[in-house]
Amino acid sequence: MFEDTTGMDSVHCSFCGKSQDEVKKIVAGPGVYICNECVDLCKQIIDQELAEDEAKKAFRVPTPGEIVNELDDYVIGQGDAKKTLAVAVYNHYKRVNAMMSGDNNDTELQKSNIAVIGPTGSGKTYLAQSLARILNVPFAIADATTLTEAGYVGEDVENIILKLLQAADFDVERAEKGIIYIDEIDKIAKKSENVSITRDVSGEGVQQALLKILEGTIANVPPQGGRKHPQQEFIQVDTKNILFIVGGAFDGIETIVKERLGDKTIGFGTDSREAEEVTDKNILQHVIPEDLLKFGLIPEFIGRLPVMTALEKLDEDDLVRILTEPKNALVKQYQELIRLDGSQLTFTDGALRAMAQLAIKRNTGARGLRSIIEDVMRDVMFDLPSRKDVEKVIIDKRCVTQHTEPRYVLKDEKAS
């Protein structure tokens, strides 16, 4: 039984040593005292540990349908790729949960790392980011072109894991269930299929270096990065439950696909149904592992990527939808920024299509839309905060193509 110490002679907290004059309250027990500050601290520690335990237990994996529904809120089009990614991610984390709970029925479930092929600006990185956000797991992006095999100047492959650790605030257990997206993976392809004549060390060597972490290994990760601190203690991270998604544009692989399909690409041959479906827009969806091998990825590397999907090139209609439809669409973001200045913002259909056409002309895809709309909006966002008489700003096609002034609808005009 605990009792109040008010009125007692001076006593001290048995935990922190503070006297009752230094704290608001001290509670006495049989031969022990505890102050209000230590009670609060104990409660915080217990609450935090309970929350962490619950989070570990409650790692519910959304169904593929739920994942696609979430992706639809942020990513326009690419229906086939969304389904493929949703199923692969669901199976991966179902496997992780089974391994953690021991419910694997003595059957070894292998990793389902993913290769995503798609033109620049088609949404490869954004899809991977969105998956990590939906699953609430740490996420890191690496650029394959910066990686080198051991012994050469550049980044070690272990630095990829370091980025994931940093995203997880160095919580190793969380990092071991994260997602890593490796971009520009096509840039580490061998320069020639005949390695005895041309051995591309920076390409094939990096592929070889990535094999172990893709499959699952205990990686020794330098917390300070790289080779500049050889005396640092390494952090051990098990990569067997980390989902790796690799992406690249694979420029020129269309030619390899067309050569393999031969006459079928123009509608001849026995499999006419498949032939009629092959177009310049969807040809990447017909890429098979043999095409990647011919492109320059080594067989062992391709074997670590059992799931493969392709993104279609975005056309004008796709880019207009990307500008306007997602929850975080660029148009909605800029409308909110202008609303915070007390005005409204409208883009005409001509303006939206002009921005989409400009992104296509620059071959930047969706990723180029931000810089285009920022350029269009720069003067508006500079002038508007100093004006209180503007009811609405209208951006039309000429604002995009000729950099003309937008139309300002003044509050007095609306009233009249």
Curated annotation (Swiss-Prot):
GO molecular function, one term: ATP-dependent protein folding chaperone
GO CC list: HslUV protease complex
GO process terms (BP): cell division; proteolysis involved in protein catabolic process
Residues the record lists as binding ATP: P119, T120, G121, S122, G123, K124, T125, Y126
Family, per entry: Belongs to the ClpX chaperone family.
Function description: ATP-dependent specificity component of the Clp protease. It directs the protease to specific substrates. Can perform chaperone functions in the absence of ClpP.
PANTHER family per the UniProt record, alphabetical: ATP-DEPENDENT CLP PROTEASE ATP-BINDING SUBUNIT CLPX-LIKE, MITOCHONDRIAL, ATP-DEPENDENT CLP PROTEASE ATP-BINDING SUBUNIT CLPX-LIKE, MITOCHONDRIAL-RELATED
Self-association and partners: Component of the ClpX-ClpP complex. Forms a hexameric ring that, in the presence of ATP, binds to fourteen ClpP subunits assembled into a disk-like structure with a central cavity, resembling the structure of eukaryotic proteasomes.
Descriptive protein name: ATP-dependent Clp protease ATP-binding subunit ClpX
Organism, scientific name: Limosilactobacillus reuteri (strain DSM 20016)
